Amino acid sequence: MPNQRIRIRLKAFDHKLIDQSTAEIVETAKRTGAQVSGPIPLPTRKERYTILTSPHVNKDARDQYEIRTHKRLVDIIEPTDKTVDALMRLDLAAGVDVQISLG
């Protein structure tokens, strides 16, 4: 695959899980002879929600919740056919969203 690049974006709520998945991807790509750029940490998205705990009055009684979405970016430069096959067979954790683009 001359002049190819595989860009892998990972999203997860658990930072330990996403770091483990990126380590597996990088190790697999390096083992098959491809150049790897990354993992590059992208900005973490924080979504905050405020909910009233009282059903009627007492507006001061509130709970606050936060969801953090962690993101990582891995570029595989000049992948071989063995690299693509190994990445297709790779089994990642269930809590990690993976987006792959060729370019």
UniProtKB/Swiss-Prot annotation:
The keyword Ribonucleoprotein applies. The keyword Cell inner membrane does not apply. One of its GO terms (cellular component) is ribonucleoprotein complex. One of its GO terms (biological process) is translation. Transmembrane segments: none annotated. Disulfide bonds: none annotated. InterPro entries: Ribosomal_uS10 (IPR001848), Ribosomal_uS10_CS (IPR018268), Ribosomal_uS10_dom (IPR027486), Ribosomal_uS10_dom_sf (IPR036838). Keywords: Ribonucleoprotein, Ribosomal protein. GO terms for molecular function: structural constituent of ribosome; tRNA binding. SMART domains: Ribosomal_S10 (SM01403). Part of the 30S ribosomal subunit. NCBIfam families: PRK00596.1, rpsJ_bact. Involved in the binding of tRNA to the ribosomes. Belongs to the universal ribosomal protein uS10 family. This is Small ribosomal subunit protein uS10. It comes from Pseudoalteromonas atlantica (strain T6c / ATCC BAA-1087). The lineage of its organism: Bacteria, Pseudomonadati, Pseudomonadota, Gammaproteobacteria, Alteromonadales. The gene is rpsJ.
